[in-house]
Amino acid sequence: MYNIFFHRASKFPGPTIAGATSFRYHWAMSTGNVAPWLREQHARYGEVVRIAPDMISYVSPDAWKDIYAYKPGEKEQNGIDWTIPSRDDDVPSMFSEPNDAEHNRVRRLFLPAFSDRALKQQEPLLSKYSDQLVHLIRRGIDDNRDQEFDAVKLYNFTTFDIMGDLTFGEPLGLLKNSSYSEWVQNLFRDIKTAGIFLFIFDFPPLPWLVKKFSPPSIQRAHEIHKQHTVDRVNRRLEKGLDRPDIWNLVLSQPEGRGLTHPQMHANADIFMIAGTETTATLLSGLTYLLLKNPEKLQRLVEEIRGSFGSIEELTVENLARLPYLSACLSEGLRCYPPVPIGPSRVTPKTGGQVLGERVPGRVRLTIPQCAAYYSDLNFKDPYSFIPERWLPGTGYESDRKGILQPFLIGPRNCIGQNLAYHEMRLILCKLLWHYDIELCPDKGNWLLDQKMYIFWEKRPLMVKFTKARK
């Protein structure tokens, strides 16, 4: 009763059960049904909804700055809420570092590795693995022209090999072996259980109990995974500074040596999650959406093949100039956000203000992209895949496009967003340059039928490739 009527956040609208206990939210999260549940709540209550006793959800574009941006002149900023625990003796990664000053210091060390200049140096590496993907498909259809491929696996193989090379100085060999390594399988397992860990970290005694009483097999798997990361990073560091990868650009700075080895291990681990699965997710979802909308696919193919005379012209710089490709990426990120439930923020003890309304202290604030991007408050025809909405003069000028922030905003936004865009453009365009793609028969809606545990649980997306008819 206290939470419903007298809690500091009780003035905000929302379902009574969610105001009474956070179990309703965590039940939706742990069962993979949080995306449709959040959409239903915002459709019923509007753009501000209380989804747990101390958690408020927003779908307004103006809420981004109020929640996530740095506010000059204010003594206290919104803080991070939950964190992804690092696997190296609880040493925080850049993502999970609670201290703003330390986060900013570490982030500044990594920024040169994700600059335009650095990404230009890394373009040959991106091309190398996107070409390996093209050749893997070619070998398959040369052996059997009716062979079906799982596009989800193909994209994961490619993004993990790219990020493995950038992070560890060596590929993981997924494209070469056409299979996941045990280390990558462990990453996917951890992603699926992330929703359960959110519940655990919401109740302070539980993390200690889980850690103390976890089965020995789980603890061993954790230690093996951690040691694998440590060994790979250490091998890379022993190679020196002769490679244009992340560690070269970090350690070549005098202050870059201020990172401890445990900090390097923790950040390498988070790079391998944030820089792989998310990019592959967008590519998988966009491929499905294009194949389900053949007229959109045809327009994109014509733009790619009609803009260049040879494969050598498909550079990240040239591809960034293609307007319909950019529109497709934006619409793909809207329809299928790789991080559908982003990290929330918590107001300082003195409280804060969102959308002109005072929010009490120690209240969690979030903008769930899986709900915001499907709200008819923000988009006309929100359940339709319409890349044209991102182009001028197409009748979608009233869309509140500022809500689309797939990489967040503010001092803790995604440091690797430019790398992600380069990967997405290069991988997708090389496939569409070389191949015509066809969706294999399937039941249901591959996209909307998915469960979501922090990230989407993707089932196989089976497709066929044939050599492009140019």
Swiss-Prot record:
GO terms for molecular function: heme binding; iron ion binding; monooxygenase activity; oxidoreductase activity, acting on paired donors, with incorporation or reduction of molecular oxygen. The lineage of its organism: Eukaryota, Fungi, Dikarya, Ascomycota, Pezizomycotina. Gene3D superfamilies: Cytochrome P450. Cytochrome P450 monooxygenase; part of the gene cluster that mediates the biosynthesis of fumonisins B1 (FB1), B2 (FB2), B3 (FB3), and B4 (FB4), which are carcinogenic mycotoxins. The biosynthesis starts with the FUM1-catalyzed carbon chain assembly from one molecule of acetyl-CoA, eight molecules of malonyl-CoA, and two molecules of methionine (in S-adenosyl form). Keywords: Heme, Iron, Metal-binding, Monooxygenase, Oxidoreductase. This is Cytochrome P450 monooxygenase FUM2. GO terms for biological process: fumonisin biosynthetic process. SUPFAM superfamilies: Cytochrome P450. Heme binds at residue 414. It comes from the Eukaryota. Pathway: Mycotoxin biosynthesis. Belongs to the cytochrome P450 family. It is an enzyme of class 1 (oxidoreductase). Its EC number is 1.-.-.-. InterPro entries: Cyt_P450, Cyt_P450_E_grp-I, Cyt_P450_sf, Cytochrome_P450_monoxygenase. Its cofactor is heme.
